[in-house]
Amino acid sequence: VVYSHGDVDRVFPLASVTKPIVAWSALVAVERGLISLDDPAGPEGATVRHLLAHASGLPFEGRRPVAAPEKRRIYSNEGFDILGEVIETATGVGVAQWVRETIFEPLGMATADIPGSPAHAGVASASDVSLFGAELARPTLVNGPLAALAALSQFPALAGVVPGYGRFNPCPWGLGLEIRGEKTPHWTAPDASPRTIGHFGQSGSFV
């Protein structure tokens, strides 16, 4: 933490910052051989990779696809709810428990929990979110090649909308991580590198 103001140990809703945390736990499952990025998941023709990259064709909410997989970048809570089901089936434990065992406990994120949807229901303190940010910067829980893949745009030609910021063509997204690319306006700093990765949430959270 470079600078802080206020109570950094107070627990706040993470909103969609829940998504990259759950995505990272899915990559742990991939590394352990429990899930493959190319396993079928969600709508017909979609895979775990499509769900992580918001390329499955699912809408924001609801399980009726609005596009074929790999045609549009459609930001989808539903896709991450389905990803949670995939994790539970593959690991044999609830998604909240899986994330706790593979992410929160190893990183020392003592205040963090996901008491509801794996798309948006996470809670944690700012200090704990900073621990996850440090993991993204220098991965310890996911191997180097897989972490590097997560930070590369999947289906890079897809256009799509970043909620609250507009439509971009292309709209790069990695495996659960938004990639800055050439998007303007954007929630990251104006001079941020196009390779910047992270996520923001409606509650005012970001990582």
Placement of each model-derived feature along the sequence:
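Active-site Gly/Thr loop motif
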Residues: A119-S127, L152-V207
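Active-site-proximal helix/loop microenvironment
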Residues: A112-L131, L136
